[in-house]
Amino acid sequence: MNTPQDSSLGREVSYPSQYDPGLLFPIPRSGARAEIGLDDAALPFVGHDRWHAFELSWLDPRGKPQVAVATVQVPCTSPRLIESKSFKLYLNSLNSTRIDSAEALRARIVADLSDCAGAPVQVEFGLPGLRETPLGESIDGLELEIDCYGPPQADFLSANAGEVVEETLVSALLKSNCPVTGQPDWATVSLRYRGPKIDRAGLLRYLVSYREHAEFHEQCVERIFSEVSARCQPQWLEVEARYTRRGGLDINPWRASPGIAAPAATYRELRQ
């Protein structure tokens, strides 16, 4: 079984000079899910991992360089996630490769990523536009003392069963760390839900308690979804984290209660 420590993360690697789908490094989702009591065969959520790729280039049949940007969507039901540095190296391996057309390139990327993830992956050229302010109500202006930065503390979460609301809460203060390199991962996270009103101060303390936590982006979002669901008992819940760019890629994991329609990729955060 592949582990993060087996990947190219934290290692000096030479950039590929020719196309090589073998650079893609899959990591099973099951291990991290088991740690928080999730079973791949009975997931409590639907969702996807949406990537924005900013550094995509190849050669046309005459050798002229071409450039593009792309949006990639990996279903959360795939047995494997795609490690980000390997994804970057894979895209770099296309830089000196002659390809008949943009559509031929897209089809090749779809096939390679689907094989890596173990499920059909969607790839489209183009990116959503920027939005200066996130959709929802920010909780970052709350005045409170915080002294816990990890590990994540679900005990901070609570909700008022006597007041049922439907709202979207947003924080730009989510930070976690790569489990291999220790590099910081920054994100704006939004929680849209209907149910007992979530205590905002407790939610902010909970999100800040990820600050020294080491876990991949996708795993953090699944942990947030699971712990908010368990502690606050919403009727339904959506959690999305929009991470800042690294190596020409940003990732946006989204998890939601079954039956919730996937959001359209209509915008990117200003920090992306």
From Swiss-Prot:
NADPH binds at S84, K85, R246, G247. Keywords: Cytoplasm, NADP, Oxidoreductase, Queuosine biosynthesis. Its EC number is 1.7.1.13. It comes from the Bacteria. The active site is at C178 (thioimide intermediate), D185 (proton donor). HAMAP family: QueF_type2. Homodimer. This is NADPH-dependent 7-cyano-7-deazaguanine reductase. It comes from Stenotrophomonas maltophilia (strain K279a).
